[in-house]
Amino acid sequence: MSKGTPSFGKHNKGKTHIRCRRCGRHSFNVRKGYCVACGFGRSKRMRRYSWQNKKSWTRVRLK
């Protein structure tokens, strides 16, 4: 059994992500045990950041 670069070829076997129980998206990491989309398994709160949504231009004064 060798380690390093030859071992990385074994990473493509099996599923990395399965369907999440909370958000329903195909983003629950089986190895890490949490959803990368909603944060299920890592946090009780939903994973949500302000940079995910585009900022509205209502406060900007047009020239």
Swiss-Prot record:
Entry superkingdom: Archaea
Cofactor(s) recorded in Swiss-Prot or TrEMBL: Zn(2+)
Record keywords, A-Z: Metal-binding, Ribonucleoprotein, Ribosomal protein, RNA-binding, rRNA-binding, Zinc, Zinc-finger
Binding site for Zn(2+): 20, 23, 35, 38
Any single biological process term in GO: translation
UniProt xrefs under Gene3D superfamilies: 2.20.25.30
InterPro entries linked: Ribosomal_eL37, Ribosomal_eL37/eL43, Ribosomal_eL37_CS, Ribosomal_zn-bd
C4-type ZnF: 20-38
GO molecular function: rRNA binding; structural constituent of ribosome; zinc ion binding
Cofactor binding description: Binds 1 zinc ion per subunit.
Disulfide pairings: none
GO CC terms, sorted: cytosolic large ribosomal subunit
Described purpose of this protein according to its UniProt entry: Binds to the 23S rRNA.
The family this protein is said to belong to: Belongs to the eukaryotic ribosomal protein eL37 family.
NCBIfam families given in the database record: PRK04179.1 (NF003214)
Official protein name in the record: Large ribosomal subunit protein eL37
Lineage: Archaea, Thermoproteota, Thermoprotei, Desulfurococcales, Desulfurococcaceae
Gene from which this protein is expressed: rpl37e
